[in-house]
């Protein structure tokens, strides 16, 4: 099959794997939390903090961005003309309130010095427009990002193999990864490549792509069944920058004391008791944001798929920024605040995030996102039912 740009493709027996993954997700949650009073998330279980911020969408130069895209992608003039950047969340200059959930990526709560991915789940509030049918809220847009460019899987079948091995036992997962070296490398990269000094100065990528607009004849029942083309496909990124113009990029820094050599006992290297909790990132967030002059910034950027070497359905392949740089369309800002309130922590645990919660024009695309659309509601409903809660949509006006 000759593949095309901006197009997601179905996989063989895809629908069968949806049902299998739902069963595995239920089993995973029962294994983790069946005999406990409260349930955490099945991944990104350890929350560091719930932080309030703002996402400003700039009055960016749409034509300049399209000219840049035209230089990097083999697009016809009609394809370029069909791309509209100023729609949905990006439609006009505006400042939105956001809630940010900072977390570790692991399925259980581990010390922060352990190798892991770090994430921010961004909930943008006050977003108007036609919703995705799978949305669980009416005026929010969720953007989930990690401090790595990749995801752990190439295909839905691969993800089922990985996830079912994870559910069965750590030993089964190790054996599966040994048999799938490319996935082993992806997991190692995702969890071990970065242990940032602060989550407030780390860079984050969405890992999986989203549409930027829909064609007039788009049928939401078709993805996963037949090839579906979009006007454009992008990934999101948040790049830490300094507070003063020209807002230079903040270089990556590692947590002090973390050994650069693999397989070294990190607790020992840091002089920490392995039997005691290590909440380094939560402590850093609390202390950094408690300072009266605290302010942190990230450029909000979009990265276009510009060639078939940047696949939509394969989450392991990196979209190289030298081939398609992130183009700035806004800025995320976090300023001084007190965040160590018990009620705020409870509020944070009860928030529900999904890439499928948002506007139709920002539809998540690709195999990994189609899986998430099936599995995320199962996990979220389990977690809320276990807590005896009915989901409530946040407004950004909450106080604690």
What residue spans do the PLM features occupy?
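Active-site-adjacent core segments of small-molecule enzymes
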Residues: 1-400
């Amino acid at each position: 099959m000759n593949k095309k740009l901006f197009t997601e493709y179905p996989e063989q027996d895809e629908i069968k794997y949806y049902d299998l993954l739902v069963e595995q997700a239920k089993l995973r949650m029962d294994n983790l939390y069946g005999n406990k009073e409260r349930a955490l998330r099945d991944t990104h279980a350890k929350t560091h903090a719930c932080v309030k911020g703002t996402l400003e969408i700039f009055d960016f130069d749409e034509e300049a961005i399209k000219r840049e895209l035209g230089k990097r992608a083999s697009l016809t003039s009609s394809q370029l003309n069909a791309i509209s950047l100023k729609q949905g969340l990006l439609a006009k200059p505006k400042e939105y309130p956001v809630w940010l959930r900072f977390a570790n990526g692991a399925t259980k709560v581990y010390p922060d010095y352990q190798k892991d991915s770090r994430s921010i789940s961004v909930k943008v509030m006050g977003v108007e427009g036609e919703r995705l049918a799978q949305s669980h809220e009416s005026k929010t847009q969720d953007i989930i990002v990690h401090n790595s460019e990749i995801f752990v899987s190439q295909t839905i079948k691969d993800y089922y193999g990985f996830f079912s091995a994870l559910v069965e036992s750590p030993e089964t997962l190790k054996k599966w990864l040994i048999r799938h070296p490319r996935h082993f490398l992806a997991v190692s990269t995702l969890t071990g490549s970065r242990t940032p000094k602060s989550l407030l100065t780390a860079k984050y990528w969405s890992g999986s792509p989203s549409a930027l607009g829909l064609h007039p004849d788009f049928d939401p029942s078709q993805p996963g069944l037949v090839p579906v083309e979009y006007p454009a496909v992008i990934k999101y990124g948040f790049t830490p920058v300094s507070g003063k113009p020209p807002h230079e990029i903040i270089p990556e820094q590692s947590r002090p004391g973390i050994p650069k050599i693999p397989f070294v006992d990190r607790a020992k290297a840091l002089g920490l008791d392995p039997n005691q909790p290590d909440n380094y990132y939560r402590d850093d967030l609390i202390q950094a944001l408690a300072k009266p002059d605290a302010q942190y910034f990230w450029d909000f950027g979009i990265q276009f798929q510009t060639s078939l070497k940047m696949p939509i359905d394969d989450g392991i392949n990196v979209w190289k920024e030298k081939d398609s740089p992130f183009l700035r369309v806004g800025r995320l800002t976090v300023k001084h605040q007190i965040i160590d309130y018990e009620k705020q922590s409870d509020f944070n645990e009860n928030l529900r995030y999904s890439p499928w919660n948002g506007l139709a024009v920002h539809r998540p695309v690709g195999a990994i996102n189609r899986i998430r659309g099936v599995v995320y509601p199962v996990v979220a409903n389990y977690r809320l039912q276990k807590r005896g809660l009915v989901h409530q949509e946040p407004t950004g006006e909450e106080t604690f």
